[in-house]
From Swiss-Prot:
Belongs to the glycyl radical enzyme (GRE) family. It is an enzyme of class 4 (lyase). This is Probable dehydratase PflD. The keyword Lyase applies. One of its GO terms (molecular function) is lyase activity. Residues 3-637 form the PFL domain. Residues 645-765 form the Glycine radical domain. Its EC number is 4.2.1.-. The keyword Lyase applies. Probably shows dehydratase activity. It comes from Escherichia coli (strain K12). The gene is pflD.
Amino acid sequence: MTNRISRLKTALFANTREISLERALLYTASHRQTEGEPVILRRAKATAYILEHVEISIRDEELIAGNRTVKPRAGIMSPEMDPYWLLKELDQFPTRPQDRFAISEEDKRIYREELFPYWEKRSMKDFINGQMTDEVKAATNTQIFSINQTDKGQGHIIIDYPRLLNHGLGELVAQMQQHCQQQPENHFYQAALLLLEASQKHILRYAELAETMAANCTDAQRREELLTIAEISRHNAQHKPQTFWQACQLFWYMNIILQYESNASSLSLGRFDQYMLPFYQTSLTQGEDAAFLKELLESLWVKCNDIVLLRSTSSARYFAGFPTGYTALLGGLTENGRSAVNVLSFLCLDAYQSVQLPQPNLGVRTNALIDTPFLMKTAETIRFGTGIPQIFNDEVVVPAFLNRGVSLEDARDYSVVGCVELSIPGRTYGLHDIAMFNLLKVMEICLHENEGNAALTYEGLLEQIRAKISHYITLMVEGSNICDIGHRDWAPVPLLSSFISDCLEKGRDITDGGARYNFSGVQGIGIANLSDSLHALKGMVFEQQRLSFDELLSVLKANFATPEGEKVRARLINRFEKYGNDIDEVDNISAELLRHYCKEVEKYQNPRGGYFTPGSYTVSAHVPLGSVVGATPDGRFAGEQLADGGLSPMLGQDAQGPTAVLKSVSKLDNTLLSNGTLLNVKFTPATLEGEAGLRKLADFLRAFTQLKLQHIQFNVVNADTLREAQQRPQDYAGLVVRVAGYSAFFVELSKEIQDDIIRRTAHQL
C-alpha cells in the first residue's frame, strides 16, 4: 500500500458519520414542481435535478473522483420511500446500538417541518401498507417472515458494465434518442434519455471542479493529477474509455449516479476482472507503470467504502455493519466453458490485500479447472482474516441457473449481488432478498398447536410443519408481490434499466418486467435448528419416550428454568446428534425440509412474469429472528439466535471438524437454492500458518468444490482477539471480520452480533 492509499484510507474514517439531507431536499424540490406527470418522468426529473445541483467534491490526493456526499461515509435519506421510520428515529441515530449517525438539530427541524409533511401519505410505504392484508401483516409482525425493501430502493442488481465501458455515454445517448424518435410516447425512453444526458452533465461538473482546483493548486504533482482527472472526465462524458484510469473513473461515476437515483443497497460490481481486463492491458501496452495501475485499483477499492446505507434500527439488526454490497466475483468460466482467471484476477486480490477494508465484497469462483497459483492466491488472501474473498462453486451454480431457464452462456457468466445472491450481470432483475422466512418459528407454532394432542405422531407433526410452511409461503409471496408492485408504481429506475438487457428492446423499466430474467428471491432461515430440534424431539418423545410431548412442551415454555428443565436441556444437547457432523439421520431431516421449502417457493410467479427462487442465507437476521422464537428442542434458549449463515450448523454444535461440516451441507440440494446460500467456517490463525497452512486451505477448497457445495466463507481470528476488541474498541478500529455474506468493522457491530461471531466454532485443519 502506497503512502497515498494509506492516507486516503485513514481520512475516510477520520470523522463521525453524519446524516445528509441534501438528496432528500433536492428530490423533494423537484417533486413539488412535477405534480400530475407520469411517475417515471417525475423520478427521472428529480434525479436529474440532484445531479445538477448536489454539491460535489474531489478530496485531497484522490485519483478517482466522485463522492455521493461531501463528507465521507454520510448517510442519505429517501423519504419518498418511507418517511415514517425516519421521523420516529430522528433522535435515536447518534445513540442506537447499531449503525450510528450524527444529525444536527437544524436538520431534525427541517425534516420534521418540511420533508415529513410533504411525504406523509405520498410515499411508497403508504401504498404497500395500504395493500397488505391483515393476515400478511400479522405474519410479518410475529416475524414468521419479513418483507424487505419496503423503505428503500431495491438495488441488488448488476448493470451491464461492458455496455457502459465499451460504448460510452455519447453513443448510449444517441441510441436512446433513436428509441425516443421511434416511440415518442414511451415514457421509459424519455426518462432514460433525460438521465443519460444528466449523467454527462454531472461528469462535466467534476471536470470543471478539477480544473478550478488545479488552477489554485500550488503542488505541481497534484495539479497535474487534477488536470488529468479533468481531462478524463471530459473524455468520459462523451466517449468510451480507452485506458484503465478512464475505465475506473467512468465505472465509479456511474456507481455514484445510480446511488442518487435509488439510494439502494447492492448495486454490485459483477465480473470486474473480466470487463476491465482490456483497459488494463491497453494501459500496460501504452507504457503505464504497473505499480501505478495497482494504486489506481487500490484507490477504487478505498472509494467503495465511502458509501454507507442509512437503515432503520430494525433493518440494521437484519443487515448489521453497513453491508453496501459492492460485490465482485473473480475467475470462473468464459462463455465457452474455459477458465476465466487472468492477470487482473490476481491484481484484484493483491490490491485487496493492501487495503483490507469491508468493501469491495470480493468473491472467487472455483471449479474443476481452477489452477493452483490462483487457488493459492485466494487462500493467501483468506488468511489475512477479513473474511474476503468468499468462494462460489461453478459446479453447482451453473446447473442451478440452467434449471431456472437461463441459457448456458449466460449461466457461465453469473456473478453475485449483495451478500451471496446469484445473478446474471446486466440481464437479471432478481428482487433478491425480498423476504426472509423463519422456518423455526413455523415449527414453534406447530408444537404449540398440538398441545394436548395425545394421538400426535412424529410423522404427523412433520406433515403439519410442511403444510404450515406451505401456507405461510403463500402469504410471503403475497406480501413480496405487493412490494414488487410498489417499486413498479412508485420507484422505477430508468437510468439503471437502460443498462439491463432487454429493457431497451421492450421499452420497459426493470420494475415493469423489462429485464431478460425476472426472479423474486426469498430466504429460508433456521434449517439447522429445525432439523436439530426435530431429531431430538423424535428421539426424546417418540422413540425413547423419556417425556411425553406435553411434558417437553411444558419444559420449553418454562425456558428450561427448573432443575428438571436443566437436565432435559443437557440431554437434548448432548445425547442427540446435530446437523454439521456428517450424521445422515439429522442431515437428511435438513435436506428433506429444505427441499420442501424450495419446491413450494418455486411454484409462484411474480408480477413481472418471472418466478420465485429460494435461497438460504441470513445476513445478520439470525439474531432478530431468533429473538422471537421460544425455547426449542435442540436445547436453544428462548430468544437465542438461530444458526448463523443459512446453512451453517448451530453455534458450538459442529464438533467433528470442518470436513464433516462440508459433508453435511453437501447432502442438501444446493442446486435448488438458486437465490444463494451461505456457509460460515471459522479457523484459528495458527492452523493456516506457513506454506503448509496455505496448502491445507487450498486442499479444503478443492474438497468444497468436489463435494458440490455452493458457497463458503471464512473468519480467521482468535476469539481472545475479538474479546479484547470489545473491551478496547479504540485499539481495534481497523479489525475487519466476516458477518454473513459480507465483512464489517468488528467495532461497528452491535454487541449481540459481536458475541455471535465470538461464539462460532473455531476449527483446525
